[in-house]
Amino acid sequence: MSFSSFELLDQSKPILVFGRDGQVGKALQACFKDIKIPVVFLGRADCDLADEASINQVLNQYQPQVIINAAAYTAVDNAEGQPELAFSVNRHAPKVMAHYIANLSHGIFVHYSTDYVFADTKKTAYLETDVTGPVDQLSIYGKSKLAGEEAIEEIFNLAQDSGHASYQDKFSRYFILRTSWVYGDGGNFIRTMLRLAGERDQLKVVADQVGVPTSSQWLAEVGIQMAGSRVESGIYHAVPDGETSWHGLAVFAIETAASAGEGVEVKSENILPIPATDYPLPAKRPYNSRMSNQKLKLALSEMAFTNRYPHWQEQVEAYVKDYVSSSLKS
């Protein structure tokens, strides 16, 4: 991967990545390993995203011209009982980062968001232009992530409308990358299913929630590529092609693991589909998490990012085979 299309105004100032220890954060570290640009990765111990003073201290210390925010309060069910913390991390923290980029460093801001900003107002794939919410039908997590998106857009729109010469000359830009069903290096649905498949002879998996499984490695690559591009600011749906249910994903992952030599107890016919109502949880989950990726495809094609856009199945297959291979070696 190349960062050659991104013209850093001052290469002594590092790219700042928040969320070092998450699945996307770990993938970003791997992506940046071979790129000769200074990068600083921050975790919870380095910056408290619920504390504005802590964020500002880090921003003033490093003075970044590029921020990639892969951090979030993602404990969806816990957020129902901790709304203030969820909003601090998911709304106020990215607002502070966006203000710094738009008004002080005049650089690039990449922010990862979620399918949880939608509340089943469509039965087909959502476009970036579709109305989000309604807010009263979203989980606390969804509300806080949507509020973060809106805060970022407001900050950049106000900076642009101000007509400040440095903003216009230096092309401050933001990219909000909405995604869904992320998996990578860390705890996730696929790893849970593979573990349970080795322990049980029957599984019950929700079949009436539909979305797009997305590789954290691919998400990291897309985020870096967008930061290094000259494409238009805005929201982009960053998901592969295709769609499936949680049940469909479980079946595909387990069958792939079995073919790769992983010992599994459960047979495909014993992975039973159930409705989400049979598995009640504190926070609301969208039944429809489909998101159209056509806008992102067009942007990436203009950058010659890839000759072929990925399908979720090929990404999951590669992930499972790599995971099984690593497990067999250990």
Model feature map: region roles:
Residues 81-110:
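NAD(P)-cofactor binding segment of oxidoreductase domains
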Residues 6-31:
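N-terminal Rossmann NAD(P)H-binding glycine-rich loop of SDR-like oxidoreductase domains
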Residues 33, 37-57:
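Adenosine-cofactor binding site in Rossmann-like domains, unifying the SAM/SAH pocket
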Residues 222, 229-282, 324-329:
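Mid/C-terminal beta-alpha module of Rossmann-like enzyme folds, strongest
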Residues 151-211, 217-218, 225:
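NAD(P)-dependent short-chain dehydrogenase/reductase
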Residues 52-91:
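NAD(P)H-binding glycine-rich loop region in Rossmannoid oxidoreductase-like domains
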Residues 88, 93-96, 117-177:
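Catalytic helix-loop patch of NAD(P)-dependent Rossmann-fold dehydrogenases
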Residues 2-6, 309-330:
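Amphipathic terminal alpha-helices
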